[in-house]
Design a protein with these regions (language model features):
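Mixed-charge (Asp/Glu-Lys/Arg
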Residues: 1-118
Length: 118
């Protein structure tokens, strides 16, 4: 039910919902304009970059994860989050994420994040 609601949201509504959920989790949240990362999350001195703009794509490959990884290196982030509300992640993308400190946030993990904010 939560995921169905997310799939009908415009980008701004989804971005605001994610930011509120991360703030509820104790993160300082900075929304970024353009580029591979949409959010910079800071907590206890650690920086995490999150990419969520492609949340409605049907398939997710390695390229956006490579771009996120490059942004992580540029900003000195220790971790990355890649958010998808629908579609599937290719096997290569899943392996790339695992090997490059990128956590995939989808399905139950996404629902839990969004429900925690309410």
């Amino acid at each position: 039910q939560t995921l169905q609601a997310v799939q009908t949201m415009p980008w701004r509504g989804f971005a605001d919902t994610l930011a509120a959920a991360w703030r509820q989790g104790g993160f300082e949240v900075q929304q970024l304009d353009g580029g591979a990362a949409d959010f910079c999350l800071t907590k206890s001195g650690s920086t995490t970059l999150a990419s969520a703009r492609r949340w409605k794509a049907a398939t997710h490959g390695v390229e956006p994860l490579r771009e996120l990884r490059a942004a992580m290196e540029q900003r000195g982030a220790t971790a990355g989050l890649y958010v998808l509300a629908q579609g599937s992640l290719s096997d290569n993308a899943r392996l790339y994420a695992r090997d490059n400190s990128i956590t995939i946030v989808q399905d139950n993990a996404l629902a839990a994040l969004l429900l925690a904010k309410s």
